[in-house]
């Protein structure tokens, strides 16, 4: 029994007894009749927050004074009345004051514990084990009046327990009523799940409609982009020392040289090595392009445009170079004014270089 911690639990209360080397009990709530009958709790029902230790006669020792059973009973009645009225665990002012006093006197009590422990151990050595086995709650009554007070208190507990049982039965009755109507519950569950399925189908329908709408919008955007390309076809003049006007491209002020590109032309069975003349062309941009064409803007800015013209008798070779890619075109005619024109439809030249609306481009690869 020495240096042992004892715990007692029931459905509403927890009681802790610390080891006997420091025999102080912390009693926080009133506990049931079954708990009172345990042999290692040799004290009567004490209500409130109380600190102390137990004497061999079964009374709670606190400041070397015995707390009378009547006082503890009075506190218990106040507690039970508060439960009946408010339905909550309330502690009266007297017990709160007792708790404060106990906390202030804790050091004094600890000093008394050593002396008490010695006396307690002496009593245990004098056949206390046999006494504890045969003891009962009645053995601790010091008088008939005290026993009567206990029976009255016990009856109070029984009355309150009956009230609690009635309350529990009412709760069980409500549960039984619910069990007698399973169809209503099943009907509610069915309606709830049906509503969930309807909501899920509605969400799927909305998602499909949104996808269709996005596809239609994308198709319209593609058509607008294609139409925009056709309207931005090449139209302008290319002069030997002039300006090149381009529409539908996303770069401007582009200059380029076709340096040291040699073109071999056979004319009248004579091999002649002709060096192209370099020109600088100013590019004027009409920034009217589609969104997806703008993705190639950075790549287009690295391209160069060079227009070179070589006149050999009546034969002109026009070369367009893009990133060292050379395209030779022969048998193109040039007039005396030095203005070269190219018709994309029949590869003939006369005057201005004008393309039809059917040809369009958005990058230098189309030139």
Curated annotation (Swiss-Prot):
Transmembrane segments: none annotated. Residues 332-347 have a biased composition (Polar residues). It comes from the Eukaryota. Residues 97-136 have a biased composition (Acidic residues). Residues 137-150, 159-169 have a biased composition (Basic and acidic residues). Residues 97-231, 316-367 are annotated as: Disordered. Residues 210-219, 316-328, 348-367 have a biased composition (Low complexity). This is Uncharacterized protein DDB_G0290803. It comes from Dictyostelium discoideum (Social amoeba).
